[in-house]
Amino acid sequence: MGAQGFFLAVEGIDGSGKSGIVRSLAAHLGAEGRDVLVTREPGGTPEGEAIRGLVLAGADEAWDPMAELLLMTAARVQHVRRVIAPALAQGQVVISDRYAGSTLAYQGTGRGLSEAFIRTLHAEATGDLWPDLTLVLDLEAGIGLARSRRRLTGETLDEGRFESLDLAFHERIRAAFLAQAARDPGRHAVIDASGTPEEVQARACAALTPFLAQAPV
């Protein structure tokens, strides 16, 4: 359990609807009277948002995988120490749109870096802070990629570096998230992300409720 609060991460492939579910869950929990903080990775702090702009834009070959990992970790240090840990200490429910599960999936499985090294680096950088619960929004990779590319077409900010990669890459990422959930079922729930936003929200709320019932928030 994350200090006095509750730490929830929402993970999934690009186009799985994470941001919408984060907003819906925050509204739902807020209506229940809970003190909710919504954040995202990479980002969450001015320094993290600057790193986000560096890492998510440009050509895929712009960053060496190790450099990419270290940038993501640098952003997370700021995020945990300045935002997440203080909020948990104050008893808030923290909902993060991506966290370390994405690092294991994208920089580990996707880029071929050592999972053991990523976990060691994470432990040193964050005090080994992991979410109390990670919701994995699961969707066929082809559907998610098509959704994500449609969304990016209408945006001015270029955050489409990972969306430019082929379907096989995104299928590996999906498999990586599912493998994480299978290895640690006590801290993960896989949510079917197909269907309407309302249907997905209902599934997410149903998975979250028993965990929050045991939380001191």
UniProtKB/Swiss-Prot annotation:
GO biological process: dTDP biosynthetic process; dTTP biosynthetic process; dUDP biosynthetic process
The keyword Transmembrane appears for this protein: no
Enzyme class: transferase
UniProt cross-references to CDD domains, sorted A to Z: TMPK
GO cellular component, one term: cytosol
Gene Ontology MF terms: ATP binding; dTMP kinase activity
InterPro entries: P-loop_NTPase, Thymidylate_kin-like_dom, Thymidylate_kin_CS, Thymidylate_kinase
Catalytic reaction annotation: dTMP + ATP = dTDP + ADP
EC id: 2.7.4.9
HAMAP family reported for this sequence: Thymidylate_kinase (MF_00165)
Family listed: Belongs to the thymidylate kinase family.
Job of this protein: Phosphorylation of dTMP to form dTDP in both de novo and salvage pathways of dTTP synthesis.
Name of the protein this chain belongs to: Thymidylate kinase
Organism: Cereibacter sphaeroides (strain KD131 / KCTC 12085)
Gene (name only): tmk
